[in-house]
């Protein structure tokens, strides 16, 4: 099999990024519109921050966060319970030959941003940045 000449770095390829973004957008739309036939899931507001795909595009990991940050484990259970219906909706809307298997994790980006902001607001760090 020929090696991809356009991607030598350790990060994801352009195709992985593009497919991940299409899946993220589709998941967000499906969850926002309430297209899933689960009243518990439809009453929640869920943010899909990022979707990362495996190099072979067989697995997609969606990083999600419920609005307000409360009930994270419940949201993961609800999404896992409705995974097949979400996967079917993604398959219809994306037109991919194979729809990736969905996995869900809590998005911790906002927590890391708060920690970083807190660090930058410390007096010692501010002095170092100003010098």
Swiss-Prot record:
GO cellular component: cytosol
GO MF term list: ribosomal small subunit binding
GO biological process annotation, one example: maturation of SSU-rRNA
Keyword Cytoplasm: yes
Entry keywords, A to Z: Cytoplasm, Ribosome biogenesis
Disulfide bonds: none
A Pfam family annotated for this UniProt entry: RBFA
SUPFAM superfamilies named in the record: Ribosome-binding factor A, RbfA
Compartment(s) where it occurs, according to its Swiss-Prot or TrEMBL record: Cytoplasm
Keyword Hydrolase included in the entry's annotation: no
Main location: cytoplasm
Parts forming coiled coils: none
UniProt similarity note: Belongs to the RbfA family.
PANTHER family xrefs: RIBOSOME-BINDING FACTOR A, CHLOROPLASTIC-RELATED
Subunit structure: Monomer. Binds 30S ribosomal subunits, but not 50S ribosomal subunits or 70S ribosomes.
Function, as annotated: One of several proteins that assist in the late maturation steps of the functional core of the 30S ribosomal subunit. Associates with free 30S ribosomal subunits (but not with 30S subunits that are part of 70S ribosomes or polysomes). Required for efficient processing of 16S rRNA. May interact with the 5'-terminal helix region of 16S rRNA.
Protein name: Ribosome-binding factor A
Biological source species: Ruegeria sp. (strain TM1040)
Annotated gene: rbfA
